[in-house]
Amino acid sequence: MHISILLMEQIIELFIMIFMGFIIVKTGIVKDEDSKVLSKIVLYLNIPCVIINAFQVDYTSKTVRGLLIAFAASVILQLVLLFIISAMGRLFHMNEVEVASVYYSNSGNLIVPIVTFILGQEWVLYGCAFMSVQLVFLWTHCKKIISRESSYDWRKIVLNINMISIVIGVVLFFTRIHLPQIINDTIGSVGSMIGPASMIVTGMLFAGMDLKKVFANRRVYFVTFLRMLLVPLISLILIKISHMAYLSADAPKIMLIVFLAVITPSASTVTQMCQVYGNDSRYASAINVVTTLCAVVTMPVMVLLYEEFI
């Protein structure tokens, strides 16, 4: 119950940030299309800093074991969910924005502040394991469907700053190299901007929408149901039957972090990619806002279910 209450408080904070983005557009300080610049900063600066900073922890056998559990769980969950959601996409005639919004969680923007707030900074590393796996899918599968490209450009994928940051972070961790304090502090400070920046982008886009059309669109609620209820319940079942939460003394908390990453609202990164690659960013933002609104209730409930059944 304690974790659920802390989680609800954190989500409310994020909503206030969305409201700030909404206000600066409605008062004429900036235009909603100005959010595209901020989206690029999040994608190409904040996220890489978060990843590198998370891997700047002491190398111990306990940490390595926990990291391997987190990586294995993240890969298994995301592969199974990709198969299930792709099948649902064909069954329910979902477009690429809807499929991406159901599949991709907002772990990249929310898991760091949420885990730091409810468990502590030392546990963020395991959330970044999920983020790293999801980033691979984001810059392959998601980029392909959002940009409507017919094939993968592997050179661009491999040389993407987010992929490079994963490699740098992992290499630094396993070679036990710690960056100079001033550099590490700078990277940490820039990375800490990810939550506020992403929520402000969402608020700015939301301010430019016709709110009546947003809330009158039944598809938004259908996508929200899939993202916030069905996907978390499927994930909970997968975690239960896999027994991965019983692999070590820390495994229950590690799997809780992976579960938290899965049950977050639809990814702000989908909205940002829609902006960058010319897809329907307003629809993606509408889904993001409605799922974030629902998260105030659904995420604490799902955590309670996790604590009860895992």
Regions found by a protein language model. Name each.
Residues 1-310:
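Alpha-helical transmembrane segments of multi-pass small-molecule/ion transporters
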